[in-house]
Design a protein with these regions (language model features):
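Short, Lys/Arg-enriched N-terminal segments with co-localized hydrophobic residues
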Residues: 1-18, 52
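N-terminal chloroplast transit peptides
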Residues: 8, 20-43
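N-terminal mitochondrial targeting presequences
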Residues: 38, 53-57
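Class I (Rossmann-like) S-adenosyl-L-methionine-dependent methyltransferase catalytic domain
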Residues: 59-112, 126-176, 197-198, 202, ...
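Conserved class I S-adenosyl-L-methionine
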Residues: 115-123
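A conserved beta-strand element that flanks and buttresses the S-adenosyl-L-methionine
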Residues: 183
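Short catalytic micro-motifs in class I SAM-dependent methyltransferases
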Residues: 186-190
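Short glycine-dipeptide loop
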Residues: 206-210
Length: 281
């Protein structure tokens, strides 16, 4: 007997290829629930009312911090590792994220040696980007809103003998300083749409030369699939997921004195990310 989740995945497989490509925004949330959880669509009014009551008392920042300090840390730490304790959807997300990280590393390598250059990685997670950049010789300042994530990144770096990377706990708005390069990868999905331009502006204020940012783009089919995901309540619905208008991001970069130099789209079955590299002009 198929569960509601299995039925949904079966339906996804029959969609047009462009519809199958999905961002972390919707199906990822369902896929990351414990495998033993039973999902069934709830009445729209019940789901909406419950969500409204929760969101009126818990702001985005608190929600994200609590999630990634608790059950979210355990799930995503497995995804961002070589652990075999992941399902096919989680493995697909891992592959997509790894592709984004590799593209950034390739771009930076193509621009020459970064040994001694300063890099600020905002929303560093477990160090997926910060650690390889440190191995390339960059001086790393990496932060995450989650103590658990930042500590895990620091432990991984220490185990590798890395000494040129500092990891600490901070939200995006509180990050200060000046750096050659500022990165913010797969973080904007947790950031409110109406504050996106302001956040991009802040990241730019930290960068002397370059900003790299990725986000889940706002398109009609991702909006549709996000709505489908919202029909499935339960423990997996832990944080709000935001899709962003690419033009808003580009306008914010331009306003801050940056110009997009390179861009890339990474898409797998359950991961979709738009990556922009902007340089100061």
């Amino acid at each position: 007997r198929l569960s509601a989740r299995s039925l949904l995945f079966s339906e996804i497989k029959q969609l047009h290829p462009t519809m199958k490509t999905f961002s972390v925004a919707a199906l990822a949330a369902i896929a990351l629930a414990p495998n033993t959880a039973a999902f069934s669509p709830a009445p729209r009014s019940v789901t909406a009312n419950a969500r409204s009551a929760l969101f009126s008392t818990v702001d985005d920042k608190t929600e994200v911090r609590e999630y990634f300090n608790n059950e979210g840390f355990n799930r995503w730490n497995k995804i961002y590792s070589e652990s075999d304790e992941v399902n096919n959807v989680q493995l697909d997300i891992r592959n997509g994220h790894d592709q984004t990280i590799q593209k950034i590393l390739n771009w930076i390598s193509d621009d020459g040696d970064i040994a001694g250059k300063t890099v600020c990685d905002c929303g560093c997670g477990v160090g997926s980007l910060a650690i390889p950049l440190a191995q390339m010789g960059a001086k790393i300042s990496a932060s995450d809103i989650s103590d658990a994530m930042a500590n895990e990144a620091a432990d991984r770096a220490k185990a590798m003998g890395i000494r040129n990377a500092k990891f600490y706990t901070s939200d995006l708005e509180s990050v200060k300083g000046k750096y050659n390069t500022v990165t913010c990868v797969d973080v904007a999905i947790h950031y409110p749409t109406e504050k996106m331009a302001e956040m991009v502006g802040h990241l730019c204020s930290l960068a002397d030369e370059r900003v790299l940012i990725s986000f889940a783009p706002k398109t009609w089919y991702y909006e549709l699939l996000k709505k489908i995901g919202e029909l499935f309540p339960g423990p997996s619905k832990t944080t709000r997921a935001y899709l962003h208008d690419e033009q808003v991001v580009r306008d914010a970069l331009q306003k801050a004195g940056f110009e997009v130099a390179r861009e890339e789209m990474t898409g797998t079955s359950f991961y979709f990310s738009r990556l922009l590299e902007a340089k100061r002009v």
